[in-house]
Amino acid sequence: MDKLLERFLHYVSLDTQSKSGVRQVPSTEGQWKLLRLLKQQLEEMGLVNITLSEKGTLMATLPANVEGDIPAIGFISHVDTSPDFSGKNVNPQIVENYRGGDIALGIGDEVLSPVMFPVLHQLLGQTLITTDGKTLLGADDKAGVAEIMTALAVLKGNPIPHGEIKVAFTPDEEVGKGAKHFDVEEFGAQWAYTVDGGGVGELEFENFNAASVNIKIVGNNVHPGTAKGVMVNALSLAARIHAEVPADEAPETTEGYEGFYHLASMKGTVDRAEMHYIIRDFDRKQFEARKRKMMEIAKKVGKGLHPDCYIELVIEDSYYNMREKVVEHPHILDIAQQAMRDCHITPEMKPIRGGTDGAQLSFMGLPCPNLFTGGYNYHGKHEFVTLEGMEKAVQVIVRIAELTAKRGQ
């Protein structure tokens, strides 16, 4: 465990922010830097079958140290950080023995407050790693990367019985492309766990069904003084579209298993406007209904427009709820829960109000629930992780490997 914090701080010092709307994978050069560093560290650690694909998927194998028909299992994390907030020049703060109250983030007015983030009340006495208020931290998912690397070092340096352990580090998870170029057959695991969750004890096997909705609106611009009966204001049409979307079904008004419509961006002029929504729902039927609703709204608002003016709507599914694939293999969850209990952690089964690479991988034939990392408040300046939570994640990874070996012997 002595190098866990050192690894994490090294990884977050590299800017690996991914970029949406880019064809190449990985979408940024910074991700390659971390992937090459990890490849070198895996080689130095003595892992075998190390490959780094042209699409930035890094895979490696820790050979089994016991005989028997033991299934090969995998652990996966992503190297990119969210494009939602800057990941450049990350300057972590280490708060040892947190005693409660506000934590100043850097030298400005930014604070990490238990008033806004009550979970801090549960973390008294722990070591917190925060931002300086200018960037995100990158615990999502460099905490997971550091935890997997540290677990490998523990397994390599101690006589803990384990079968073949596969590890993978993927790019562009935050922009939904991480798993698209993942070769499940080459990876060679019967099942895997992404290490990409939140607080200690989280074990997730349900996630949103997800789709993106891109709307292009073409209007007609003329001088406002002579516009009657001629102007078609694309911005006004955009406003009408959003007014038809249920206001009480937005991210800021939903929780738990509730789905939502989210207007992520909107830009334009009188002549042309663009809107980008994301749709999320755990229930497949409700998910399909939400997509139909968006089409109906576009038809309603676009009815009767001049032939040269139009509303174009494109819906693209991003990923689906992995529950249906994971529950076919209950032992995957049983082992993870037992590993947590053995590490004195109460498993907390909760739905992911988002997605992970594991969701896509589960539909590609690799059942892949999600383990906690010990991090909180991802994608922004209030992101932080606890050192104790990271250490617990390492213990759980190691224990999963050990329990899987016992199961196969």
From Swiss-Prot:
Positions of the catalytic residues: 80, 173
EC number(s) from the headed UniProt entry: 3.4.11.4
Compartment(s) of residence: Cytoplasm
Positions contributing to Zn(2+) 2 binding: 140, 174, 379
Cofactor note: Binds 2 Zn(2+) ions per subunit.
GO biological process: peptide catabolic process; proteolysis
GO CC terms, sorted: cytosol
Keywords: Aminopeptidase, Cytoplasm, Hydrolase, Metal-binding, Metalloprotease, Protease, Zinc
SUPFAM superfamilies xref list: Bacterial exopeptidase dimerisation domain, Zn-dependent exopeptidases
Pfam families membership: M20_dimer, Peptidase_M20
Top EC class of this enzyme: hydrolase
Function comment: Cleaves the N-terminal amino acid of tripeptides.
Catalytically driven reaction(s): Release of the N-terminal residue from a tripeptide
Chief location: cytoplasm
Family: Belongs to the peptidase M20B family.
Binding site for Zn(2+) 1: 78, 140, 196
Gene3D superfamilies: 3.30.70.360, Zn peptidases
Protein name: Peptidase T
GO molecular function annotations of the record: metallopeptidase activity; tripeptide aminopeptidase activity; zinc ion binding
Organism: Salmonella paratyphi A (strain AKU_12601)
Cofactor names: Zn(2+)
PROSITE patterns recorded: ARGE_DAPE_CPG2_1 (PS00758), ARGE_DAPE_CPG2_2 (PS00759)
